[in-house]
């Protein structure tokens, strides 16, 4: 397929030079040129993720492009990417960018065109909508898979029907979860055995009673003082493992049970590159993490295509990039619950399945 003509400039959402961090549209940015091992993607849809406001808030980088989850079409390829990726111009792909980066301020999904290393994207199966592909994004490509099978060290693999409460019902494991009561039916339909109200002051104790003091593994996607205490209260008398999604507060952990081994997961490590962030967020380069990701990526795409995994219910919002900033602010205000917000960037005449 002949490569399509490209504009010289495009639009992107970037961090504004404000405190606290806000976002703005950059109207006239040069279209990025892919390096030898990269592909250039024309973005068709983007999805919101909590990291879209959390990372800029922790590590401000004015002018850096924001956004993680996306889907789109390959429009240019570096020569190494042509040889190694198995992709071709015109293929439909999805992935999650490492955005709001001091080292790579051009990286970010909330743009009309993005460049991405070929190994970090996955080819979208036939028949998928742009919205579905974008909605899968960061949660499965990085943090959750890493949290379950690397940080928590679960045995077994997700071969059985595995649908999302905080990701999966894996083979041989019972899953309980927490959410708002309005979402109980949804998470139980996705595979959770039982859901508990995280607003309840006895949430942790209720889980511990339900699991008869035998709960061993806990994944905490919120990772605040309140949720950490709830998770520790839920783990059985014999102790277990706790995994958070944020840097853990040592002062709080020092007051909690020593029979629980606590750690946290940062999906940025799965690029294999150095994570050049300050303080406890720094990570040295780890190529083995990237090798694991490439294998995991192949597995989860197959599971999604077979219908054994699915994203949160998708809410499509119109307005393109101009409305994405409003969406980020709704997440920051915690007004989003039990849904994945997706914004199409294509025009209506091209709407349909991939």
Swiss-Prot record:
Query: Can you name the source organism?
Result: Acremonium sp
Which pathway, per its entry?
A: Mycotoxin biosynthesis
Keywords assigned by UniProt, alphabetized: NADP, Nucleotide-binding, Oxidoreductase, Virulence
Q: Which gene encodes it?
A: pydC
Family membership noted in the UniProt record: Belongs to the zinc-containing alcohol dehydrogenase family.
Q: Which residues bind NADP(+)?
A: 51-54, 180-183, 198, 245-246, 336-337
Q: What is its EC number?
A: 1.-.-.-
Q: Which SMART domains match?
A: PKS_ER
Query: What is this protein's function per UniProt?
Result: Trans-enoyl reductase; part of the gene cluster that mediates the biosynthesis of pyrrocidines, fungal natural products containing a macrocyclic para-cyclophane connected to a decahydrofluorene ring system that show potent antibiotic activities toward Gram-negative bacteria. Within the pathway, the PKS-NRPS pydA, with the help of the trans-enoyl reductase pydC, synthesize the polyketide-tyrosyl acyl thioester product which can be reductively off-loaded by the terminal reductase (R) domain in pydA.
Which residue numbers delimit the Enoyl reductase (ER) domain? 16-342
Q: What InterPro entries has UniProt attached to this entry?
A: ADH-like_N, GroES-like_sf, NAD(P)-bd_dom_sf, PKS_ER, Trans-enoyl_RdTase-like
Name of the protein described by the UniProt record = Trans-enoyl reductase pydC
- Report which superkingdom the organism of origin falls in: Eukaryota
How is this protein organized at the quaternary level?
A: Monomer.
One GO MF term: oxidoreductase activity, acting on NAD(P)H
PANTHER family xref list: HYPOTHETICAL OXIDOREDUCTASE (EUROFUNG), TRANS-ENOYL REDUCTASE STHE
Q: Does the keyword Nucleotide-binding apply?
A: yes
């Amino acid at each position: 397929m002949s490569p399509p003509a490209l504009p010289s400039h495009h639009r992107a959402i970037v961090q504004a030079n404000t405190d606290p961090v806000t976002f703005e549209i950059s109207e006239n940015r040069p279209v990025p040129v892919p390096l030898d091992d990269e592909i250039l993607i024309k973005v068709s849809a983007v999805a919101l993720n909590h990291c879209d406001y959390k990372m800029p808030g922790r590590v401000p980088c004015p002018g850096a492009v924001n956004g993680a989850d996306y889907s789109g079409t390959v429009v240019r390829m570096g020569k190494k990417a042509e040889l190694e990726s198995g992709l071709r111009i015109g293929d439909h792909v999805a992935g999650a960018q490492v955005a709001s980066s001091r080292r790579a301020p051009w990286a970010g999904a909330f743009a009309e065109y993005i460049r991405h290393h070929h190994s970090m994207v996955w080819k979208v199966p036939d028949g998928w909508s742009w919205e579905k592909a974008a909605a899968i994004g960061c949660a499965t490509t990085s943090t959750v898979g890493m949290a379950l099978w690397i940080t928590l060290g679960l045995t077994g693999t997700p071969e059985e029907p595995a649908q999302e409460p905080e990701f999966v019902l894996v083979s041989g494991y019972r899953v309980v979860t927490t959410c708002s009561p309005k979402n109980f039916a949804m998470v139980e339909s996705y595979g959770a055995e039982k859901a508990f109200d995280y607003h309840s002051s006895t949430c942790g104790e209720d889980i511990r009673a339900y699991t008869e003091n035998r709960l061993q593994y806990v994944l905490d996607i919120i990772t605040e003082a309140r949720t950490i205490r709830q998770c520790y209260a839920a783990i059985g008398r014999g102790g277990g493992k706790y995994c958070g999604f944020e840097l853990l507060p040592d002062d709080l952990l020092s007051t909690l049970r020593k029979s629980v081994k606590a750690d946290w997961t940062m999906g940025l490590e799965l690029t294999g590159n150095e994570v050049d962030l300050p303080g406890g967020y720094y990570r040295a380069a780890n190529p083995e993490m990237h090798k694991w990701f490439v294998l995991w990526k192949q597995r989860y795409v197959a599971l999604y295509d077979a219908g054994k995994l699915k994203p949160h219910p998708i809410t499509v919002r119109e307005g393109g990039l101009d409305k994405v900033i409003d969406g980020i602010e709704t997440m920051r205000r915690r007004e989003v619950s039990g849904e994945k917000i997706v914004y199409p960037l294509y025009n209506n005449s091209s709407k349909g399945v991939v």
